């Protein structure tokens, strides 16, 4: 399902991709894409692209750990994050096999506590996703133990039906801009 649907979404979103690319490049110096090192299936590292929403000199830590994260946003960054359009380039990662459409969100390489807890519960064996059960149940504001609990619940219930439910809930949350902190 990932290859077919991910490829179709990548093609259909082409014009939007170009528009976002241009908006990032025209509103702030630096590349349009930001590549972050993420933890994938079996704890292997991979590069995950997003449209750049933060200034080039932003420290490489999770946004919620920054002091005054808003001061690092680019002029278009808040809009891209609120609409989740910054995630659009991850369709390339789905096509490459680094990501699934649905699965636990990949941890940053330096989120040792999240990686350790996921490994303890076996969640590391899943291909990470663009969206997941934890994201539709809280997105940015979840504490790590609760996030891993949702990841574990997803692992136990994983099916096409559950994935489709998560995709629909994700679209609803994005349209309502629920759970976006920065």
Task: Tell where the protein language model's regions lie, with residue ranges.
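Hydrophobic structural segments characteristic of membrane proteins
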Residues: 89-182
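Short, glycine-rich, amphipathic interfacial segments at transmembrane boundaries or analogous
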Residues: 32-72, 130-149
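A hydrophobic, helix-centered structural microdomain
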Residues: 1-56, 93, 160, 165-182
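Glycosyltransferase donor-binding loop in the core domain
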Residues: 11, 80-83, 125
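Short acidic-aromatic low-complexity motifs
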Residues: 81-91
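Conserved catalytic core of Hanks-type protein kinase domains
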Residues: 25-26, 82, 94, 138
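Short, well-ordered beta-strand elements within core beta-sheets of diverse protein domains
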Residues: 76-83, 152-156
């Amino acid at each position: 399902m990932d290859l077919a649907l991910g490829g179709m979404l990548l093609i259909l979103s082409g014009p939007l991709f170009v528009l976002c690319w241009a908006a990032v490049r025209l509103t702030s110096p630096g590349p349009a894409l930001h590549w972050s090192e993420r933890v994938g299936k079996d704890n292997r590292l991979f590069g995950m692209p997003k449209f750049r929403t933060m200034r080039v000199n932003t420290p490489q830590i999770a946004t919620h750990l920054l002091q005054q994260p808003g001061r690092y946003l680019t002029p278009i960054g808040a809009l891209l994050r609120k609409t989740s359009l910054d995630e659009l380039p991850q369709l390339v990662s789905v096509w490459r096999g680094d990501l699934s459409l649905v699965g636990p969100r990949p941890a940053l390489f330096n989120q040792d506590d999240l990686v350790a807890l996921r490994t303890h519960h076996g969640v590391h064996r899943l291909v990470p996703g663009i969206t997941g059960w934890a994201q539709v149940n809280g997105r940015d504001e979840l504490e790590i133990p609760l996030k891993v609990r949702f990841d574990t619940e997803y692992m136990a219930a994983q099916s096409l039906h559950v994935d489709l439910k998560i995709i629909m809930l994700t679209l609803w949350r994005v349209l309502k801009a629920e759970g976006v902190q920065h």
